[in-house]
Swiss-Prot record:
The gene is Frs3. GO terms for cellular component: membrane. The lineage of its organism: Eukaryota, Metazoa, Chordata, Craniata, Vertebrata. One of its GO terms (biological process) is fibroblast growth factor receptor signaling pathway. Adapter protein that links FGF and NGF receptors to downstream signaling pathways. Involved in the activation of MAP kinases. Down-regulates ERK2 signaling by interfering with the phosphorylation and nuclear translocation of ERK2. It comes from Mus musculus. This is Fibroblast growth factor receptor substrate 3. GO terms for molecular function: fibroblast growth factor receptor binding; identical protein binding. Binds NGFR, GRB2, PTPN11 and ERK2. Binds FGFR1 and NTRK1. It is found in: Membrane. A lipid is attached at residue 2 (N-myristoyl glycine). Residues 122-230, 328-414, 426-454, 469-492 are annotated as: Disordered. Transmembrane segments: none annotated. Its main location: membrane.
Length: 492
């Protein structure tokens, strides 16, 4: 990745400049390679060098960054001017660089999406409280994300974060002695994937993403996660760490609908739409699969004006809410109850197939507490004409029913022919359905045959004579002027 040499007019930069900082580039062993001036503009990091062109790293291409007591380091992506690599700079104002970079990230609405991470460490303590802000003591550094989230402090051996070539096989090197270093590359057991994407979301959402993570504690067995958990969490368990994000916009709408309709929290376990769980304040709406972390027995409904907004929120926040998985394709199963049947014959009236959203039948009330959504109940009515064998009814096991009933082959269609009345062939034939027994006409005969009621007689001699006469006519290409001497018109 090369070295960073002296910067032009380094001494002219004041110590407390708001956007320019005096930095010194260091290598893997902590050896100083050169000095320069790091400037933070509105869109990129700029390193001014002496008698050389400035090196620029756009904020959109920064994968991660962090700081220690006197060391600021970051990891650049492949689209940067320097290519992929990790750069470390000594600076007495490393914390100021970090804070300013976070503010610029927020102004540019740059978010870093982190995939679900499971960190397995054999030496991980069972209980640990994470600090709310960036840690102050030296010895380790918080690996910060571009949206302001501080990462977990590095444990075990410290790793240096000085600049290295992208082609280096291992980006982990031991720290030189007592030198305080910044860890940007985690251990092999830890798998982080960050995607730095610019978004044009509203300011409220950006502020939500830029809030620091709350304190992470080990969840006790007696504690239960409530459905109104609104802040992201870091759950520390023996041997692993789980990152739990906050509720998505669609999830917030569901909780809002739940607060407006308290009766929806205890839905009846049957397939009838007419029940006390129907929300009186809002009309009946379509089913939205946003019950990832909520109780499974609630069939949530959204208002009609929020349907399009919820679908848009699903597409915009597809990388942020992992509990909002897409619904499974419908699987045909035995219908639990006829729409118009009586309440007492719920087990004997199963003569239809209905798609299941969860993959299991919605049979007896005391076995399956899940309530089918509105779209599923509508599909049940449309497929109520398919018979189900007796073995699939009340005593059948609670498994998938892949017994697809298809209709039999269609009856053969009968084609009706109408006899065309020909002139000069005797009396007319009666019109009506005729048996298409004759498939083709007989071949032409060289001599006249007896006239038939259904076929015409072709005069072959006359046809051949007319054909020869047509071939004998000179072809007129339009280049010869016609007169009375060379006219091609035949005499009448």
């Amino acid at each position: 990745m090369g070295s960073c040499w002296s910067c032009l007019d380094r001494d002219s930069v004041p110590h407390n400049h708001p956007t320019k900082f005096k930095v010194t580039n260091v290598d893997d062993e902590g050896v100083e390679l050169g000095s320069g001036v790091m400037e933070l503009t509105q869109s990129e990091l700029v390193l001014h060098l002496h008698q050389r062109e400035a090196v620029r790293w756009p904020y959109l291409c920064l994968r991660r960054y962090g700081y220690d007591s006197n060391l600021f380091s970051f990891e650049s992506g492949r689209r940067c001017q320097t290519g992929q690599g990790i750069f470390a700079f000594k600076c007495s104002r490393a914390e100021d660089i970090f804070n300013l970079l976070q503010d610029l990230m927020q102004c540019n609405s740059i978010n870093v999406t982190e995939e679900p991470v499971i960190i397995t460490r054999s030496s991980h303590p069972p209980e640990l409280d994470l600090p709310r802000g960036p840690p102050q003591p030296a010895g380790y550094t918080v690996s910060g994300f571009s949206n302001g989230f501080p990462g977990c402090p590095g444990e075990g051996p410290r790793f240096s974060s000085a600049p290295r070539r992208p082609s280096t096989s291992s980006l982990r090197h031991p720290s030189p002695g007592e030198e305080s270093t910044h860890t940007l590359i985690a251990s092999e057991e830890q798998s982080h994937t960050y995607v730095n994407t610019p978004t044009g979301d509203e300011d409220g959402r950006s502020r939500h993403c830029l809030q620091p993570l709350p304190e992470g504690r080990v969840p006790l067995p007696a504690q239960t996660q409530g459905s109104d958990q609104r802040d992201p969490q870091v759950l520390l368990q023996p041997g692993q760490v789980k990152f739990v994000l906050g509720p998505t916009p669609a999830r917030r709408q569901v909780m809002k609908c739940q607060s407006l309709c308290p009766g929806m929290q205890d839905p009846p376990h049957h397939n009838n739409n007419e029940g006390p769980s129907e929300c009186p304040a809002q009309p009946k709406c379509t089913y939205e699969n946003v019950s990832g972390g909520l109780q499974q027995g609630a069939g949530w409904r959204l208002s009609p004006e929020e349907r399009g907004w919820s679908g848009l929120a699903h597409r915009r926040a597809a990388l942020l809410h992992y509990e909002n998985l897409p619904p499974l394709p419908p699987v045909w199963e035995s219908q639990g109850q006829q729409p118009g049947g009586e309440a007492g014959d719920d087990g004997d009236s199963r003569d239809g197939l209905t798609p299941s959203s969860n993959g299991f039948p919605d049979g007896e009330e005391d076995e399956t507490p899940l309530q089918k959504p509105t779209s599923t109940r509508a599909s049940a009515r449309s497929h109520s004409g398919f018979p189900v064998p007796l073995t699939r009814r009340r005593g059948s096991p609670r498994v998938f029913n892949f017994d697809f009933r298809r209709q039999g082959p269609e009856p053969p269609r009968q084609l009706n022919y109408i006899q065309v009345e020909l002139k000069g062939w005797g009396t007319a034939r009666p019109k009506g359905p005729q048996n298409p027994s004759v498939s083709g006409a007989p071949g032409p005969t060289p001599h006249p045959v007896r006239s038939s009621d259904s076929y015409a007689v072709i005069d072959l001699k006359k046809t051949a004579a007319m054909s020869d006469l047509q071939r004998a006519l000179p072809r007129d290409d339009g280049a010869v002027r016609k007169t009375r001497h060379n006219s091609t018109d035949l005499p009448l």
